[in-house]
């Protein structure tokens, strides 16, 4: 991927959504909503404070994150759909068990 986010921007790849419910019902692609979880692929250097020092981001590359349904801007890079969003659009980091 040849995309480097600036400031507090984060590049996220949506994770595939389950196409089958717990009871075994298959959800067709046309009825499935876009997933609201993704994996962080790249992060920017962060915002700057009043003195010009960078403020580090709370997320890191590889984190699994939750975000709003309409968060971010969709871009296509190397045939892959990615989201570019601000860190503040990310609601939570999903911790692995």
From Swiss-Prot:
For the keyword Kinase, the answer is: no
The record, for InterPro entries, names: Chaperonin_GroES, Chaperonin_GroES_sf, Chaprnonin_Cpn10_CS, GroES-like_sf
Gene Ontology terms, MF aspect: ATP binding; metal ion binding; protein folding chaperone; protein-folding chaperone binding; unfolded protein binding
Q: Where in the cell is it found?
A: Cytoplasm
Q: Which Pfam family is one of those matched by this entry?
A: Cpn10
Chaperone among the record's keywords? yes
Which keywords does the record carry?
A: Chaperone, Cytoplasm
The protein's predominant localisation is cytoplasm
Gene3D superfamilies assigned: GroES chaperonin (2.30.33.40)
Annotated S-S bridges = none
What GO terms in the biological process aspect are recorded for it?
A: chaperone cofactor-dependent protein refolding
CC terms in the record's Gene Ontology section: cytoplasm
Q: Record's family?
A: Belongs to the GroES chaperonin family.
Cite the record's note on assembly: Heptamer of 7 subunits arranged in a ring. Interacts with the chaperonin GroEL.
Q: What HAMAP family would the database entry show?
A: CH10 (MF_00580)
* Function, in words: Together with the chaperonin GroEL, plays an essential role in assisting protein folding. The GroEL-GroES system forms a nano-cage that allows encapsulation of the non-native substrate proteins and provides a physical environment optimized to promote and accelerate protein folding. GroES binds to the apical surface of the GroEL ring, thereby capping the opening of the GroEL channel.
What's the protein here called?
Answer: Co-chaperonin GroES
| Species this chain originates from | Burkholderia cepacia (Pseudomonas cepacia)
Species classification:
Bacteria, Pseudomonadati, Pseudomonadota, Betaproteobacteria, Burkholderiales
């Amino acid at each position: 991927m040849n995309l480097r986010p600036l400031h507090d921007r984060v590049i996220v790849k949506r994770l595939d959504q389950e196409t089958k419910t717990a009871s075994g019902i298959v959800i067709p692609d046309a009825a499935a909503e876009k997933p609201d979880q993704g994996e962080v692929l790249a992060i920017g250097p962060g915002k700057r404070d009043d003195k010009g020092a960078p403020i580090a981001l709370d997320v890191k590359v590889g984190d699994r994150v939750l975000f709003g349904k309409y968060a971010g801007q969709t871009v296509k890079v190397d045939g892959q759909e990615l989201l570019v969003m601000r860190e503040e659009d990310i609601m939570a980091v999903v911790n692995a068990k």
